[in-house]
C-alpha cells in the first residue's frame, strides 16, 4: 500500500491528520483557487482540514494509477472525487505524485464547475479568522 493509498483511506475516514502523515515535508499543493502553490506539510495539512470541514458527502469515485511515471516520481494516482459544498456539487481530480521515500510530494487539484468553486472559496474564507 503506497502513501497515496493510505491518503485515500484516511480521506474516506475523514481523518485529515492521518492523511497529512502521508505528505512529504516539502509537499506542494496546486489548487484552482490560487496561482501559487501552498508549500510545506503544515500549510497543506491546514488546507486539507479546512476542506474536510466544508465538504459534505466527500467520496472518491475512481482511481487511475501509473506505477512507473519516471525517475523523479515513484507513483502517480489520479483520484476522481465528488463532494458537496452547500447546494453545489464539486467534481474533480486529485493528482497525487508519490516520491521515492513513499510520501506524497505533489498534490494537484482540478475541480469544476465554477459555481461550486466559488461556493467553496466563500466557505473557506468564512473559516478564516477576521482581523
Residue ranges and their predicted role:
Residues 1-131:
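C-terminal and inter-domain tail/linker signature
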Amino acid at each position: 500500500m503506497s502513501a497515496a493509498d493510505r491518503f485515500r483511506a484516511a480521506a474516506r475516514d475523514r481523518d485529515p491528520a492521518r492523511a497529512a502523515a502521508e505528505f512529504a515535508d516539502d509537499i506542494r499543493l496546486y489548487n484552482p483557487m490560487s496561482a501559487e502553490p501552498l508549500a510545506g506539510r503544515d500549510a497543506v495539512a491546514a488546507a486539507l482540514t479546512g476542506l474536510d470541514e466544508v465538504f459534505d458527502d466527500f467520496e472518491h469515485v475512481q482511481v487511475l494509477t501509473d506505477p512507473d511515471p519516471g525517475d523523479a516520481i515513484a507513483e502517480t494516482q489520479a483520484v476522481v472525487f465528488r463532494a458537496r459544498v452547500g447546494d453545489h456539487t464539486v467534481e474533480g481530480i486529485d493528482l497525487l505524485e508519490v516520491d521515492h521515500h513513499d510520501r506524497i510530494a505533489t498534490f494537484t487539484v482540478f475541480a469544476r464547475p465554477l459555481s461550486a468553486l466559488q461556493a467553496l472559496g466563500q466557505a473557506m474564507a468564512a473559516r478564516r479568522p477576521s482581523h
